[in-house]
Amino acid sequence: MRNFKQVKEVELLADFVGFIFHQNSKRFVNKTPKLKFAEKVGVFVNPTFQEVQRHITIHSLDAVQLHGQESPELCSFLREKVKVIKVFGVDKKFNFKSTTRYDSFVDFFLFDTKTPLYGGSGRQYDWSVLSNYLGDTPFFLSGGIRPSLVNTIRNFKHSKFRGIDLNSGFEHSPSDKNIDKLKKFIEQ
C-alpha cells in the first residue's frame, strides 16, 4: 500500500498490514508510515538476509512474509528479530509434508494459490486441500479472497486456521485499497 491515508484506515481494521518490497511487484513500496495498532509486515521474494535486515531496521518491521524459496535457516535467523510468515503456493498436488522443515523456524504459514508470480493473482485454489495439512504451525488462508466468499470463509474449519490475507479482491487497482469493501467484509 502506497497511500498513507489508506494505510491508517486499514490499520484500524487489520491485525497485520503488509508492504511489498519485491521490486517486480505492481504493489512495490519504498516508504512506509508508522503504525500504532497493527503489525507492520514486509513482504519479500527470495531476499538475502542483509536485504531483509536493512528493511527491518529502516521500516521498523514487526514481521516478514517470505514468498520465495527461502531456506529454514534464513527463516530461523530472521525469527530472532521479527515474526516470520512463510508462504507456500498450493494446488491440488501440493505436498504438505514440504512445510515440516519450516515448523520450528516460522510463526505462521500462508497458503496461497500456486502461480508463476508470487501471489496477488486474484485466483482461488480449492481450499478443501487444506484438510491434508496436519502440521502444528498455524496458518493464514489466502488466494482469491473477495467479498462474495464471506460465508465460505466463515464456514472454513481447521484447527490451525488463524486468519485471512486480503489483497487484490479488495482493491480498486494494485496498491489502491477499497476501504468501503474492506469495512463491509470485516463487519460481516
Functional labels for PLM-detected ranges:
Residues 1-188:
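Conserved N-terminal beta1-alpha1 strand-loop-helix module at the mouth
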